[in-house]
Structures are given as C-alpha cells and as structure tokens.
C-alpha cells in the first residue's frame, strides 16, 4: 500500500526517482513495471504497479461498449496509458505528452493513494489540498458514508 505525499524533482529529461521506501514493494509486486496515465478527474497523472493496472483494464474491458460514457473513459485512460519500468537507480521517465497534461515542470508531488500514486505539479497539489481541506471543513460537507468513519 502506498501512503504519503512526497516532494520530488523531475530532471531535464523528465525522469523522476521513485522514493526508496516504495521501490522494494514495486519490484516484488511487478518487477518494477509501472503504468502511467492521466487522471480523468483531476489535473494529475496516475502511476500504477502493473498488477493493479491489469485489474483496472479488466474492469474497463467489462464495461458495455455501446455507452458513450464508457468509451470516453476507456479512450482517456487506456489511450493515454504508457508502460514504464524502474531503471537500476529507481527512476522512470514521464513521457512529454503526459508531463504537459499535468503541467509538470521541475517540482512535483508523488502522492500515495493506497493502490496507486498520483503525480501532481507541486503548486497544483498545494492548491487542491488547501481547497479540499476548506471544503471538508464546511458544515454538512461530510458525506453520510464518511460520518461513521473513525479516524
């Protein structure tokens, strides 16, 4: 499971180093093979270990293809998915087109989301985090299914 927000840097070629605390799990689970694609909701990228991505593909494949909403989601997620592999230094290259989508420059945030990571531009992450915190603190903003969650 992947947790926490990690400040990272992209080099001039668009490579980033996976934080060392995640590398062993990624190597044992998927031999360091990753899939990166766009997030269809937020202006960031999603990075999946290959085994997790294969579960997503199975679910996407099972969606009825006659529904435009399903085809749209399949096009966005699968059409933008790129196979990656951690190199010997634990780095991977974020393709230019995906860097442009997420507006990634030098400073970024790699955010653990249990089964995947989100990769954000640092300023965008700071802004969405502040907005999320403000929104959830509003009276009545907590959904019913979260009210019973003990943190």
From Swiss-Prot:
Q: Which Pfam families match?
A: MraZ
Q: Name one GO biological process term.
A: negative regulation of DNA-templated transcription initiation
What are the GO cellular component annotations? cytoplasm; nucleoid
SUPFAM superfamilies the record matches: AbrB/MazE/MraZ-like (SSF89447)
What's in the keyword line of the UniProt record? Cytoplasm, DNA-binding, Repeat, Transcription, Transcription regulation
Localisation: Cytoplasm, Nucleoid
| GO molecular function terms noted in the UniProt entry | DNA-binding transcription factor activity; transcription cis-regulatory region binding
- Residues of the SpoVT-AbrB domain: 5-52, 81-124
Could you name the domain of life of the organism this protein comes from?
Bacteria
Q: How does it assemble?
A: Forms oligomers.
Q: Which family does it belong to?
A: Belongs to the MraZ family.
Q: What is this protein called?
A: Transcriptional regulator MraZ
